[in-house]
Curated annotation (Swiss-Prot):
It catalyses: an N-acyl-L-aspartate + H2O = a carboxylate + L-aspartate. InterPro entries: AspA/AstE_fam, Aspartoacylase, AstE_AspA_cat, Aste_AspA_hybrid_dom. SUPFAM superfamilies: Zn-dependent exopeptidases. This is Probable aspartoacylase. One of its GO terms (cellular component) is cytosol. It comes from the Bacteria. The keyword Zinc applies. Substrate binds at R56, N63, R64, E165, Y276. Pfam families: AstE_AspA_cat, AstE_AspA_hybrid. CDD domains: M14_ASPA. Its cofactor is Zn(2+).
Length: 293
């Protein structure tokens, strides 16, 4: 497998997620923290205007702007579309990138704990995910892609890499424990890559648990699009926990319970994520699987 020569640590893809932004600032002030012997690491603040205004984005979600067709479009670009083109020129181009690995740092208001999000099943991504989960037993691995549909996340610029997602944390703030937990995952990842480049890694052959994205679920709404129910208290904060048929899912404003009614159990994630209200997403449903790496 090809060695990694250039790695990017990206923060602030969403301008109100301060953990990644201030880690990038820290690494820029103390570059020795991310320096390794056999590959080059660079940092990037992805959405500086969003950060300045403490907004997730100015015009559109930057982490949905990396479709090849959009990157090649030069007509009337908004701010995030222009940033996506700049980032693609810096790290990419998508499909033939200058960088070999992208670490994209995120936070969530949902109770996701420590999560890494994979946008493909590249063998190297599975190996590093397996190693990280062995070092951090509470780490969850969420696979969020459809092999038949082009992924538009910043991580899709190159095959190797993943997003680190930590929570719960409010938008626009820092929280020391999650800051240092994120930094620890970054450091462990860099050490793993250094050892990989040196050929010093033991062969990894074990089962890991992944949470495979199935679909998103919207809030119950009127025909005019008004929300009429909230996440049920029994489900709130239970990300990565099993939701079985017949269990409470939503609670209406007149105190009526709406139950999960599909045939098979699921494991919801991003439950009640603040940034997803505008997207019509109350939660994402996943299937818990064990795979051999």
């Amino acid at each position: 497998m090809k060695k990694i020569n250039k790695l990017a640590i990206v923060g602030g893809t969403h301008g109100n997620e301060f953990t990644g932004i201030y880690l990038v600032k820290k690494f820029e002030e103390f570059p020795e923290l991310i320096s390794r012997r056999n590959f080059d690491t660079q940092t990037l603040l992805a959405n500086p205007q969003g950060f300045e205004l403490v907004k997730r984005y100015i015009d559109t979600d930057l982490n949905r702007c990396f479709k090849v067709e959009d990157l090649e479009n030069n007509t009337s670009l908004n701010y995030e579309e222009s940033r996506a083109k700049f980032i693609n020129q810096m790290l990419g181009p998508k499909g033939n990138p200058k960088f070999d690995f992208i670490l994209d740092l995120h936070t969530t208001t949902a109770n996701m704990g420590l999560t890494i999000i994979l946008v493909n099943y590249h063998p190297f991504n599975l190996k590093i995910a397996t190693y990280l989960s062995s070092v951090e037993p509470n780490l969850k691995i969420y696979t969020c892609f459809n092999p038949e549909v082009e992924n538009t996340f910043i991580n899709s610029i190159c095959e190797r890499g993943f997003a680190i997602e930590v929570g719960p944390i409010a938008q626009g703030i820092l929280q020391a424990d999650l800051f240092y937990k994120t930094e620890k995952l970054v450091q462990i990842s860099l050490d793993f890559i250094e050892h990989f480049n040196e050929g010093k890694l033991d062969h990894i052959n074990r089962d890991i648990v992944i949470y495979k994205h199935l679909k998103v679920v919207d809030y119950p709404k009127t025909k005019d699009g008004e929300i009429v129910a909230m996440i049920h208290p029994q489900l709130q904060g239970r990300d990565y926990q099993k939701l079985s048929p017949g269990e409470p899912m939503f609670l209406t404003f007149d105190n009526q319970t709406i139950y999960y009614q599909e045939e098979s159990p699921v494991w919801p994630v991003f439950i009640n994520e603040a940034a997803y209200y505008e997207k019509g997403i109350a939660m994402c449903l996943t299937k818990k699987e064990s795979i051999r790496v």
